[in-house]
Amino acid sequence: MLAIENYLILSAILFSIGTIGVLTRRNAIVIFMCIEMMLNAVNLTFIAFSRHLGNIDGQVFVFFVMTVAAAEAAVGLALMIAFFKNRESIDVEDVNLMKL
């Protein structure tokens, strides 16, 4: 059985990769994928602490985070489709060009 430190290190690495991806990429789809990776890293932390402490609350909270992530993905994809229809691009730098 692995120690909790191993799970936390893996979670920190995944979260760092996601953060770097959000800060360095311009493609909206890649940014959303990096945000999902960050949420999964947080979920891994919740599961690790839940198992370590013998409490099920962390595992229940993961289901709420997954539900919010699914809703975020649906709304984000709808926004990207609408943006692509208008600008024929999904680069986040082009978002500033949109007028209200």
From Swiss-Prot:
Superkingdom of the source species: Bacteria
GO cellular component terms attached to this protein's record: NADH dehydrogenase complex; plasma membrane
EC number: 7.1.1.-
Gene3D superfamilies hit by this protein: 1.10.287.3510
UniProt-listed InterPro entries: NADH_UbQ_OxRdtase_chain4L/K, NUOK/Mnh_C1-like
Keywords, comma-separated and alphabetical: Cell inner membrane, Cell membrane, Membrane, NAD, Quinone, Translocase, Transmembrane, Transmembrane helix, Transport, Ubiquinone
Name of the top EC class for this enzyme: translocase
Keyword NADP: no
Topology with respect to the bilayer: Multi-pass membrane protein
Main location: membrane
Catalytic activity as recorded in UniProt: a quinone + NADH + 5 H(+)(in) = a quinol + NAD(+) + 4 H(+)(out)
Location of the protein in the cell: Cell inner membrane
Pfam families tied to this protein: Oxidored_q2
Gene Ontology biological-process entries: ATP synthesis coupled electron transport
TM stretches of this protein: 2-22, 29-49, 61-81
GO molecular-function terms, A-Z: NADH:ubiquinone reductase (non-electrogenic) activity; quinone binding
Biological role: NDH-1 shuttles electrons from NADH, via FMN and iron-sulfur (Fe-S) centers, to quinones in the respiratory chain. The immediate electron acceptor for the enzyme in this species is believed to be ubiquinone. Couples the redox reaction to proton translocation (for every two electrons transferred, four hydrogen ions are translocated across the cytoplasmic membrane), and thus conserves the redox energy in a proton gradient.
Family: Belongs to the complex I subunit 4L family.
Subunit annotation: NDH-1 is composed of 14 different subunits. Subunits NuoA, H, J, K, L, M, N constitute the membrane sector of the complex.
Record-given protein name: NADH-quinone oxidoreductase subunit K 2
Organism: Citrifermentans bemidjiense (strain ATCC BAA-1014 / DSM 16622 / JCM 12645 / Bem)
Taxonomic lineage: Bacteria, Pseudomonadati, Thermodesulfobacteriota, Desulfuromonadia, Geobacterales
